Design a protein with these regions (language model features):
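Active-site pocket-lining/capping segments in soluble small-molecule metabolic enzymes
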Residues: 119-144, 194-246, 251, 282-286
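N-terminal amphipathic alpha-helix/helix-capping segment at the start of soluble metabolic enzymes
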Residues: 1-16, 23, 228, 283-286
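Glycine-rich, proline-tolerant flexible connector loops at the mouths of alpha/beta enzymes
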Residues: 21, 42-63, 109-119, 170-183, ...
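Conserved, mostly hydrophobic/aromatic
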Residues: 17, 45, 96, 164, ...
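Active-site beta-loop-alpha junctions enriched in small/polar residues
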Residues: 18-21, 48-52, 78-84, 109-111, ...
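Active-site mouth loops of central-metabolism enzymes
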Residues: 13-29, 75-87, 140-156, 233-247
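Glycine-rich anion/phosphate-binding loops
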Residues: 29, 81-95, 118-122
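Glycine-rich, positively charged N-terminal anion/phosphate-binding segment
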Residues: 3-5, 27-36, 52-73
């Protein structure tokens, strides 16, 4: 089913994100995680690319196909373009179509300093525009409540986002954030800009201080004082930090849902226990 069609049905969409196992890990490890996550009956599951991935790597596509075939849950496959040629992309799009995976989250992808980027696609919008010429794919895009780290201003970032939507992105998923006010402010500005597609709030539970610090550095999200105190207090208490992180994410989600957000996209980090605990606390509100 087209992801964007899941919105506006009188409920808050709830979706999950997983990532493929590392190259030195068996692919079966993600299948075990999916066996638990699918019990939560999410509206869809997105599958990421690894850092520096290119369209010629079909691991993400295979996992997305596995989700749909074995669990009957729609999958949203991430597709990055910074390290891909149009020929790579054509091969992958044909592969996806043959697998019945028609929902794509179109991304530029992170630049790898060790790999010279290809020249065919410069921005996610150019990928969206290209895929729209290739058949009946349904396209989603990313958005940034605290603006993209390469954007000079919120105005510039919204201009790029509006162009991406105009090119064919039908649904947006936000980058992680830890202060809901940033999301609400961004949402208001996006709507005033004429961006009317559904916008999901991306939530990442804080369960590992080093991991969160790395993610914050990569995406530019800020850590509010309340969360900083949690990280400081429980830094060396693994289970306590996990439980506090779950509680913080639940509080965020409850506020977002009560405020009428289109959807919640949970970055699971392949941790079924944490995703399940959060779902248990919020599923009646959706």
């Amino acid at each position: 089913m087209q992801i964007s069609k899941k919105f506006g049905q009188g409920k808050t969409v709830f979706s999950l994100e997983v990532f493929p196992p590392k190259k030195d890990s068996p692919v079966e490890s993600i299948y075990r995680v999916l066996g638990e996550l699918t019990k939560l009956k999410p509206d869809f599951i997105s599958v990421t690319y690894g850092a520096g991935g290119n369209a010629a790597d079909h691991t993400t596509c295979d996992i997305a196909s596995y989700i749909q075939t074995n669990y009957g849950i729609d999958a949203l496959t991430h597709l990055t373009c910074v390290n891909s040629t149009k020929e790579d992309m054509d091969t992958t799009l044909e592969y996806l179509k043959n697998q019945g995976v028609m929902n794509i989250l179109a991304l530029r992808g992170d630049k790898n300093p060790e790999i010279e980027p290809k020249k065919d696609f410069t921005y996610a919008s150019s990928l969206v525009e290209y895929i729209k010429t290739k058949g009946d794919f349904h396209l989603s895009g990313a958005c940034y409540p605290e603006i993209h780290i390469e954007a000079s201003s919120i105005e510039e970032d919204l201009e790029h986002l509006k162009y991406k939507v105009d090119c064919g992105a039908e649904h947006l998923i936000s980058q992680l954030f830890f202060d809901n006010d940033y999301f609400f402010d961004f949402l208001e500005k996006a709507r005033k800009k004429g961006i009317t597609v559904p916008i999901e709030a991306g939530i990442m539970p804080v369960v590992n201080k080093r991991q969160i610090e790395r993610m914050v550095t990569m995406c530019g999200a800020s850590i509010p004082s309340k969360l900083a105190k949690i990280l400081q207090r429980y830094e060396h208490q693994e289970e306590a930090l996990r439980d506090a992180g779950i509680a913080y994410a639940v509080e965020q989600i409850m506020h977002l849902v009560a405020s009428g957000v289109d959807g919640i996209h949970l970055y699971t980090m392949n941790n079924a226990y944490i995703a399940t605990k959060i779902h248990e606390a919020i599923f009646r509100l959706l």
